[in-house]
């Protein structure tokens, strides 16, 4: 016979306490078996508050707690069950976890003891209380023996194998003044991230970081009219950030929110960000979700997201405005001088002449140099910085049919003059009707 089989009720049977006890076990097993498969990690705290005053005396005590034990037993302290006796932590306990425990049900073991008896392996303490008849028209009360759950605070030295236990806190040490030092990084198993303040705080922090990055990206996308690969990358990243911000905002307001649901979204987001921020464009191997060790599960993912959102993603292609001056001179001023050493420069030329003619004659009719030396290059007929025709438009900048693309020769002797210059100058000597110039810097 199974200890959890249902009772076969029949008319005229002589009822004994064993019938109801067996029926209770059957119902509890039925509910546990039906619910256990619905959610992995279906145990932990929904609420947890410790007594801070007793910590200074070397004791750990629970003020209030609500949740579910690993065996499926729900608890609500102190509303339904009394808080366990405070645990006087020994000085020898270092980096040890304190657990909230309840003895497991075992065949042949006494399940309930009377108030005042030694607990032994009992799960319940019987107390007689006056209970009102809810269906009576007048006040009608009767004494009823009620069993409250007999919780204990335990450490691993107490033999956790006989208990349904859930971690409460990790004690770093008991200091010389007898006060307990708790590990602030420890996260107990929870059913709602509200019971684990570091997780709830990170959800709000992430929402703020995503909003800031989204605003910066949106401003850059709106201000840009490039249409090249760089802007497409910004659009894709903005799409990712917008989706993540909306989802994170939703999750930060949902209660209860199981940590596994939060982890699933965070690890997916961290993997997506690697496409834009990781040098190999691939995510690292993140830890498998462990409900009994939330800190080890979340810490690497939280770090990866902070790093991804702190990374400055510069535009690969930067449009540099060209201003037409007198005597065929066009000037492009540089606001970021680091581009001289870290970027290649492309001049895009469009005119109402055949493309092959433009490709062959424009480099001969144009002189390129620094704004300070362009006059000398023209007057002394010096070559300046060479223009190298490009077979195709670089993928980082927009392609326009009919335009010809020239790369500035960084190997030119005049290139060093740009180090201390305000920008580039272009002198166009020939006649090119409908001439239109665009200038781009492409980061290496």
Curated annotation (Swiss-Prot):
Disruption phenotype: Deletion mutant shows a severely reduced secretion of VgrG1a, VgrG1c as well as Hcp1. It comes from the Bacteria. Coiled coil: none annotated. Core component of the H1 type VI (H1-T6SS) secretion system that plays a role in the release of toxins targeting both eukaryotic and prokaryotic species. Functions as a spatio-temporal marker for assembly of contractile apparatus made of TssB1 and TssC1. This role in assembly depends on TssM1. Forms transient higher-order structures that correlated with dynamics of sheath component TssB1. Interacts with TssA1. NCBIfam families: VI_chp_4. This is Type VI secretion system baseplate component TssK1. It comes from Pseudomonas aeruginosa (strain ATCC 15692 / DSM 22644 / CIP 104116 / JCM 14847 / LMG 12228 / 1C / PRS 101 / PAO1). The lineage of its organism: Bacteria, Pseudomonadati, Pseudomonadota, Gammaproteobacteria, Pseudomonadales. The gene is tssK1.
